[in-house]
Amino acid sequence: MIQLRSIINVADNSGARKVQCFKVRGGHHRDIATLGDVIMCSVRDAIPTSSIKKGDVVRAVVVRVAREKRRKDGSYIRFDENAVCIINENGEPKGTRVFGPIARELRDKNFLKIISLAPEVI
């Protein structure tokens, strides 16, 4: 569960390390984001040589959440941390690598490029 003002790790090599959520896309007065949701973030920590700088406003998709999420088959999925991947306006990732496991729910939301870059899909 990602709330407003949550500090989140970045799971790709786009150049940002940590971002802060300030808007959850997809509805009026929507305050909580979960797996596969698109959020607007401000970069809080970045690699010095990257094109993404501290303070930049970026769009990101949630790929891991620490709160358990119930799947349709009755099983639950949860991760050790909250993580996002930075995307552009078309929904394609800005980075060329994705680190760590990715939830299968991203396939249902048509983030297939992120799924193909991930080392493991759970």
Swiss-Prot record:
MF terms per GO, please? large ribosomal subunit rRNA binding; structural constituent of ribosome
Task: State the UniProt keywords alphabetically.
Answer: Ribonucleoprotein, Ribosomal protein, RNA-binding, rRNA-binding
**Transferase listed as a keyword:** no
| Listed Pfam families | Ribosomal_L14 (PF00238)
Write out the GO biological process terms. translation
Cellular component terms, GO, for this chain's entry?
cytosolic large ribosomal subunit
Q: What is this protein called?
A: Large ribosomal subunit protein uL14
Recorded source organism is Elusimicrobium minutum (strain Pei191)
Q: Top-down, what is the taxonomic lineage of the species of origin?
A: Bacteria, Pseudomonadati, Elusimicrobiota, Elusimicrobia, Elusimicrobiales
